[in-house]
């Protein structure tokens, strides 16, 4: 198993709360999920890498990874303290397929998309057979997760959603492609595959086989933390700020909702992040 955290916010937001301050932050969860960590942040000027570190496939994601347990890694704690943006995908790993290594640490980045997975797939060969040679050639690690990412990117390629200057309905094309792909995998009993997948403007969230919770935090709903953690530790909650959070576990005492098994949703970034439900069996249950 692994643990995921995703945030889509209406304005630049500091992510220290979910990464290290909350009682169920990724730093705390890494006590059991000790095989590496990764943070991918999008949407803040400081998240744009310098030219020497920039890849044409990275978009404007700023990615940091490590192989130590996050809560015991000074580098993670320092990065978590200053990580900010409008979109976050973060992950701590408990390995099931592939050794502990940077190449096997999530999130993975290709063609401007970031991806993190929680679960285990049962038939890699079948998934590879339905993945393009171009995407298979981009795999650098040993995980089933990276194969799943390559498979989903293949479906996005076929829908025209990964091309630079994609048409105005690329978001809907991407949604149809991801919905079809996840429905197929569920029907084939491909295994457990919770995931977060984002291009920085939208974030796809899927639950199948592992726990996943959602919280919509409105401009007038500041966080309420256990153990006396001050919400102001992550910066003031401004009158305009609106965010949607997704996590493998409830991070706070707020009214998180459990996503039903088989749910796919899309969170669109904007002045008021919008949740779109292309594939939600029963919506959410508190």
Predicted regions and their residues:
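A conserved acidic, glycine/proline-rich C-terminal tail/linker
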Residues: 221-264
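Catalytic core of PPM/PP2C metal-dependent serine/threonine phosphatase domains
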Residues: 87, 163-209
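Long, charge-dense
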Residues: 130-157
